[in-house]
């Protein structure tokens, strides 16, 4: 029987979903505007129309999704929290969504193995995934994550700087940007989040 007690099982994250730990490592990760709501439709922005996101694509409906990256270190690990940051500039960039990392996948056998792993959970169509794989000699890695929560109120880059989550415009995340537990708590408060899914 599924256990809904407030604890995290890092060996089987689905078993204790949707809870995440406040004390886990947390990263802010950028996502381009054109991919944001395609991957995270529950986090649709006020400037977007729901009618543009009604088609039944697997990656939109799945709780388990993937984020393809070539970012340099540091990288998150299983059980870490990731906060998605839609890029767009000083006022338009916003943090919108929390996920929890289920797996970091690096050891793909070949291109087809990469495609098979990503295609139903990524925003990218197969031809784009193939282009990503072939782009450089250094191969991408994939973060498989569980979608957890979207922020009721989205704070932008300016607010993140004012709150000292970011150190300035040049501190905007380009890869996986680690933040402290205190900064995570600041984001939760500023976004007016219901913290019932958060445990210590």
What positions do the PLM features span?
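Short coil-to-beta transition motif at edge beta-strands of beta-rich domains
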Residues: 71-88
């Amino acid at each position: 029987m599924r256990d809904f007690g407030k604890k995290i099982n890092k060996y089987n994250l689905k078993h204790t979903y949707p809870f995440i730990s406040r004390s886990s490592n947390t990263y802010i990760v950028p996502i381009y505007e054109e991919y944001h709501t395609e991957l995270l439709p529950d986090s649709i922005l006020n400037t977007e129309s729901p009618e543009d996101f009604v088609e039944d694509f697997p990656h939109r409906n799945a709780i388990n999704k993937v984020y393809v990256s070539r970012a340099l270190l540091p990288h998150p690990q299983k059980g870490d929290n990731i906060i998605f940051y839609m890029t767009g500039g000083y006022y338009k960039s916003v943090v919108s969504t929390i996920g929890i990392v289920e797996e970091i996948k690096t050891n793909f056998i070949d291109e087809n193995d990469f495609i098979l792993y990503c295609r139903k959970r990524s925003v990218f169509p197969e031809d784009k995934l193939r282009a990503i794989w072939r782009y450089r000699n250094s191969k991408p890695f994939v973060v498989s994550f569980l979608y957890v929560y979207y922020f009721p109120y989205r704070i932008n880059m300016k607010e993140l700087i004012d709150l000292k989550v970011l150190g300035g415009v040049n501190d905007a995340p380009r890869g996986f940007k680690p933040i402290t537990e205190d900064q995570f708590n600041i984001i939760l408060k500023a976004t007016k989040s219901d913290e019932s899914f958060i445990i210590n």
